Amino acid sequence: MSNQVLCCVVLCLLGANTVDGGITQSPKYLFRKEGQNVTLSCEQNLNHDAMYWYRQDPGQGLRLIYYSQIVNDFQKGDIAEGYSVSREKKESFPLTVTSAQKNPTAFYLCASSIRSSYEQYFGPGTRLTVTEDLKNVFPPKVAVFEPSEAEISHTQKATLVCLATGFYPDHVELSWWVNGKEVHSGVSTDPQPLKEQPALNDSRYCLSSRLRVSATFWQNPRNHFRCQVQFYGLSENDEWTQDRAKPVTQIVSAEAWGRADCGFTSESYQQGVLSATILYEILLGKATLYAVLVSALVLMAMVKRKDSRG
């Protein structure tokens, strides 16, 4: 590798930038069966001459796969075996994983710079998992656990816990929604999913997240809390022969309603709303019937008066 490229790698590891909209990669998550070819796209609109592809494995630093300094020219990096690239246009530098080998989830990053000796700008990355059998894919099971009374009484705070378990691969995004709107304040999510059985390569994963609100907010039974997990699984084109539902890309959610401390729960609140609605409909029906009866009596009186005058 040239000294210029080595310099760029050092700059990258010490602190490179990301540019919103400047460099795009797709897809964000990808899952493939062992032996298949996989192409990852990278586009940049920064008018940069140099472009790069890196791979990061769990617990390791970035490793250079390929780099290109001009159109129709590219050079191998440290781990070019099993990969191919092309640079037909200045703004595009696709990477193909040829005959993908089984491996834990790897993170692929595309970068660009004005020239090879300049600071590099990175895209958002692509997470790729390769497995020997698609039957290993499972969507998550999601549950929400309500706050403890001890926490509420001692701290006047309420922490809801969301637990997503039993999913593979670890291609998930977790979010909290309160009364139909996504929230970020008070949210603390694990940095990354953890293996349920660390010794197994194809172990399923789990992920937890916490949402902390005031006790008063939790004790309002009109407040609705939802934990949403976006799972990136198989596509519609992937072959599936198992006797369970195909684990396609999907959203899995769990929810909870605020719970008052005076016996007024979300269930009783909803039941009260239903009862009030029914009572309103009954009263409205009675009022309508009464109006019809009064109108009929008035009409009869008018007819009778007309007959008496005749």
From Swiss-Prot:
Keywords tagged on the record: Adaptive immunity, Cell membrane, Disulfide bond, Glycoprotein, Immunity, Membrane, Signal, Transmembrane, Transmembrane helix
Subunit structure: Disulfide-linked heterodimer with TRAV27*01J42*01C*01 alpha chain. The TR primarily interacts via its CDR3-beta domain with M/matrix protein 1-derived peptide (GILGFVFTL) displayed by HLA-A*02.01 in a 'peg-notch' recognition mode. The alpha-beta TR associates with the transmembrane signaling CD3 coreceptor proteins to form the TR-CD3 (TCR).
Domain Ig-like C1-type: from-to ranges: 140-249
Outcome of substituting residue 70 to A/G/N: Abolishes binding to M/matrix protein 1 peptide antigen
S-S pairs: 42-110, 162-227
GO biological process, one term: T cell activation involved in immune response
TM annotation in the entry: 277-299
PROSITE patterns named among the record's database cross-references: IG_LIKE
A GO CC annotation given for this chain: T cell receptor complex
Signal sequence bounds: 1-21
Tissue expression profile of the protein: Expressed in M/matrix protein 1-specific effector memory CD8-positive T cells readily detectable in the peripheral blood, secondary lymphoid organs and lung (primary site of infection) of IAV infected individuals.
Organism: Homo sapiens (Human)
Renumbered residue ranges of the record's region T cell receptor beta variable 19: 22-114
Compartment(s) of residence: Cell membrane
Pfam families: C1-set, V-set
Effect of residue 49 to A/S: Abolishes binding to M/matrix protein 1 peptide antigen
Ig-like V-type domain boundaries: 34-131
Full protein name: M1-specific T cell receptor beta chain
Location of the region described as CDR3 in the Swiss-Prot/TrEMBL record: 110-122
